[in-house]
Amino acid sequence: MKRRALLGSAAALLAQARVSLAQTPGGRKVVFEHDLPEVNLKGWSATVVEVSYAPGEASAAHRHPGITIAYVLEGEIRSKVGDEPEKTYTTGQMFLETPGQLHAVSRNASATKPAKLLAVLLAEKGKQLTTPA
């Protein structure tokens, strides 16, 4: 039950972010759906982080100990997670990282415009949220 509540909270945070960016009349639509790994969320917490990239800026390869759901707030983010091919995500798109998965590429796809994403990190309390690869 706690797992549902925590994931529901994460979904609500992301839904709120989407509404604040572009209020559209006429209901709801699914913007992201992904199967989740089996985890016990007892003793876990949710942390929401805004990540801003200057034009051309990149993050070093890294991993997260829990589940990360990322939502692009502004610009375009180039990303490679796990075995998936490298992909560009634009404003309003989302991606997911499962526990321990390598996030090999995370960078602003533009050399001239800034980019920003909102990351919801679900992890055990007290764990470092990001570790170098």
Regions found by a protein language model. Name each.
Residues 84-100:
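Short acidic-glycine-tyrosine-enriched beta hairpin
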Residues 66-83, 93:
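Glycine- and acidic-residue-biased ligand/ion/polar-headgroup-sensing regions
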Residues 101-127:
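Ligand-binding loop in jelly-roll beta-barrel domains
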Residues 2-23:
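N-terminal export signals
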Residues 58-60, 78, 95, 99-108:
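Histidine-centered metal-chelating micro-motifs
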Residues 26-60, 124:
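A short glycine-rich, His/Asp/Glu-containing loop-to-beta-strand
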Residues 57-69:
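A short beta-loop-beta micro-motif enriched in histidine and acidic residues
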